[in-house]
Amino acid sequence: MLIFFFIIGTVFGSFLGLVSERWDTEASILYGRSQCISCQSPLKWYQLIPLISQIIFKSKCHLCGVKFSYSYFILEFLSGTLFAALWFDLDFLHFFTLIISLLLSKFDIDSYAYPLNIGLAFTACFFILFPVTPIAYFLLALACFTFFINIGIGAGDILWLFFASFSLSLEEMLILIQLASALGICFLLIKKRKKIPFIPFLSFSYLIVILLPQTLLG
């Protein structure tokens, strides 16, 4: 069953990659065959097998030889790992937050933003599925405020913090923000960039916070 959960997760991760790739295009998310982004040739069925196809073909198109982004391999692997973690009783709220973080991170890496309607859809899901905390209301209001007024951090980042606040205490949220900021600054200095996608750092910090024992966090 563990392997089954992992395989299902890799398939779902592949779907998340498809969503991020086709969202701003006219191509259908649910219909139509995947194709090479360079030569537009349709991919064979065996080239669509998550993880394995990318290992065998070295993340290249079999016709034109263009290299595909390794982010798809990482997305499929991480999604498979999260689904496998359900077998070990990973809390569903943590699982749901991490899964949507994968998709939002992919959008953020590609374009430093994610679609507003996706953010609104996930917001509705959290309100429907989970109890709302006071800090969640505050962060949602702050996200709406920053959507219209630039304060140096994107509304999308704050909306992600809104999602995380459903499963973290105020103290854990502060630790998460400090850790993500430190990691982001280190990345900026090492890579000598002026701008970075912040949601991947928030997501990684979230994972660390939920895995660390409460005694260490305290």
Regions found by a protein language model. Give the residues of each.
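A membrane-topology feature that recognizes alpha-helical transmembrane segments
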Residues: 1-218
